[in-house]
Amino acid sequence: MAAASKSLSFLKPLFVSLARPSSSSSSSLALSRARTIAIPNPLFSANSRSLSSVAFAQSTTENGGGGGGSRAIAPPQTPVVEELQRIDVNPPKGTRDFPPEEMRLRNWLFQNFREVSRLFGFEEVDFPVLESEALYIRKAGEEIREQLYCFEDRGNRRVALRPELTPSLARLVLQKGKSLSLPVKWYAVGQCWRYERMTRGRRREHYQWNMDIIGVPEVTAEAELISSIVTFFKRIGITASDVGFKVSSRKLLQEVLSHYSIHEDLFAKVCIIIDKIGKLPLDDIKKELKAVGVSTEAVEQILQVLSIKSLTTLEEIIGGAGEAIAELKQLFSLAEKFGYSEWVQFDASVVRGLAYYTGVVFEGFDRQGKLRAICGGGRYDQLLSTFGGDDVPACGFGFGDAVIVELLKDKGLLPELNLEVKNIVCALDPNLQGAAATVATILRDKGQSVDLVLENKPLKWVFKRAARINAERLILVGSSEWQRGTVGVKILATGEQNEIKLDELE
């Protein structure tokens, strides 16, 4: 197949032994200061005090054979000052650039999101980044409404950058209507925006992985969703000793409040406050509960119950006949069957901040307590009806990209993702640049990646370039070899070198 001896004379001067650089040098771009450009402009005086003086030529032309002469003055050149103002080279606060090294990490993360979703039989969907503001203010909760990036467009419509994906999914389900065959299993990876206080792993712009199941009323849906997240964690090296899931139920909280005679009209407000447990001092939680109308005695009783971490103990306090207790028992039983029981624990204080949750809720957390919620989700059986449709059983979760990257950093689990190009192709003569392009096309047509050297560069530069892009092979196009229909090929890892015919180049 590959012709040629391994000690070809033409290759000896070409494949010099060069040390690979340990790292690539960084470069920076500087913005120019204001600069002045002189352009012809007969409308302005050359000696105007508001402009720089500009020298211009005057020429005198005599008319031949006539009386008197005429002097032609060249129009003055008037300087126009281009103010190249210095701009902040950083992106807006809370947002990010993705240079190649960061983009490789993002692609790796998203690839894992998608592969896990497909393992569980989910199909990918996406939605507009810009949605009607009404989509989020109906049932999202007070916190989300305060964090919206919203404005009025030129058609006098109130719109918002999506702060999450679930309302858009609900809208799409309603749009498809009866053409959908339930149950639906969809996933999405999309950009979201929230104007919130930034902490580590929490930004104003982030990407979010969602998985949702529409049309299944049983708690088996929640159990499978948690299983998918556990599968993702295992794929990237996260263990049950690193991350856990706190599980509870909105129905359970309703039963607790009813047990202590708290009116159901206060439920939404109480949920928002309880969701702050662990984020605010307990005294602040008590003050907020009292401020919405919960009595001092009831506040103490509720907080005592919500501190319980045992489903059995809670069952003894409020009774075990409730629907919420039964669903949670089934969920923990399913966790054993799915094989992730060591990942989950009961925590009555988990309610999630979004107002549309109606049943089981869960939240992934960092066991070391360094980061806020890693992911979270639950059941939202009544969300579609708030948009004008019928009640449809549904549940799902959201998983942000920023916080998981911080967790991987803490655990030393960030992958090394270098640029990898299989071939680097270089012409040894500027006149052979077209031939090198032909070689690159042959390889690309066979599905191989190629970095084509587009300029006339010394071999030392080419070897350094090959090292930086982690190329496997260096392919050199020389004049005599090209006339024979061959190219020089060097395997960079071993130093093996050959002359190979074009039609045998694989």
Would you name each region that the model predicts?
Residues 57, 68-81, 88:
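Alpha-helical segments
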